Structure formats: structure tokens, C-alpha cells
């Protein structure tokens, strides 16, 4: 039972990372998608670079950069601002900005798959831009991107174990610690069953 309570505490951290990442990265991804599709070429370029960097570098590296960069670039110890929770906050920031880039590309592909005739028909019917998006584009977009977003959500579940990179103790890290201390693999199997 001690093992299960320790794994339960780790599971709560994993669930927190998962839920907060989804809560913020899904809408942020939509904003990044709009920025990527903006008519302003400078804005479009900035978001294209952001997406390329986030999708082209490993999440583990991004977590390390988010955690250590403020101190090494600005000499600011953010740990003193946030206390012991800065590790978790750094993990959340890293996950959110990483997954927002992936969701932005998923949304962009979904938006580009909607025929131009849909927009033209909405304009002829007197819909404004927001009404067109809300009543015509968004329902189609949701249906088109749902399978890909679901795949990304499954990847996020597995990626929560990368929080150990900056010493955030989530479920898989707890399982490794228990297995190392007791020289028994049961904790890893239980964690694996809970994870996957």
C-alpha cells in the first residue's frame, strides 16, 4: 500500500502536467495558427520560426532551456520567485509552448483542408468573419483535426515522464526510485499499467 500511495502522488503530478498542458496549449495553438496564417509577413515569419524550433528540437532540451535559461541569460533566479514550485512551472511552460506548436500545425492543416467555396458561400450569405469561423469553419475543423489531436494527446500522456529532466517527480520517476530502492520491478509494472 505504501508503494501505491507513492505512485498515486506521482500520478497526481503526471495528471497535473497533462491537464494544464492541454488546457493552455489547445487554445494557444489556435492563436499560433492564426499568427502563422496572418497576412503580415513579419508576423507569419516569427510564428513559422517558433513552430520550426519547437517541432525541430527535443522536448527534453526545451525543458532544460526553460528551466536554466532565465538564470544564465538574465541572472534571475526564478526559484526564489516561485519557491520550490519553479521546477513544475518550468515543466508546464515547456510542455505548453511545445504542444502549442504541434497543435498549431494540426489546426493549420485542418483550416487549409476546408474548401475556399465554404468561405465564399458564407460571405454571400452575409456572414462576417467571426460568424463564418464560428458557424461554418469551426465545426468542420473540429471534425477534421480530432483524430490527429487525439494522437497528440496520447503522446502527451507518455511525454509527462520527461518531467524528470528538471527533477519534477512524477509517477514514472517514483516507480524507478521504488524499484531501485527495493530491487523489485513491481513498481515499474504497476506504473506502466497505470500510464498506458
Task: Give the location of each predicted region.
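Transmembrane alpha-helices and adjacent helix-loop boundaries
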Residues: 1-196
Amino acid at each position: 500500500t505504501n508503494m501505491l500511495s507513492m505512485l498515486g502522488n506521482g500520478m497526481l503530478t503526471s495528471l497535473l502536467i497533462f491537464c494544464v498542458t492541454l488546457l493552455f496549449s489547445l487554445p494557444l495553438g489556435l492563436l499560433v495558427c492564426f499568427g502563422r496564417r496572418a497576412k503580415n509577413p513579419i508576423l507569419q515569419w516569427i510564428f513559422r520560426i517558433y513552430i520550426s524550433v519547437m517541432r525541430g528540437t527535443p522536448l527534453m532540451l526545451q525543458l532544460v532551456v526553460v528551466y536554466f535559461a532565465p538564470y544564465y541569460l538574465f541572472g534571475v533566479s526564478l526559484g526564489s520567485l516561485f519557491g520550490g514550485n519553479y521546477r513544475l512551472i518550468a515543466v508546464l511552460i515547456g510542455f505548453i509552448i511545445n504542444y502549442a506548436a504541434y497543435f498549431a500545425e494540426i489546426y493549420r492543416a485542418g483550416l487549409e483542408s476546408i474548401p475556399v467555396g465554404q468561405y465564399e458561400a458564407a460571405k454571400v450569405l452575409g456572414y462576417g468573419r467571426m460568424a463564418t469561423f464560428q458557424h461554418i469553419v469551426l465545426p468542420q475543423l473540429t471534425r477534421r483535426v480530432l483524430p490527429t489531436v487525439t494522437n497528440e494527446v496520447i503522446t502527451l500522456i507518455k511525454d509527462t515522464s520527461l518531467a524528470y529532466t528538471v527533477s519534477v517527480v512524477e509517477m514514472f520517476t517514483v516507480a524507478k526510485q521504488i524499484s531501485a530502492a527495493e530491487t523489485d520491478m513491481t513498481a515499474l509494472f504497476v506504473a506502466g499499467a497505470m500510464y498506458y
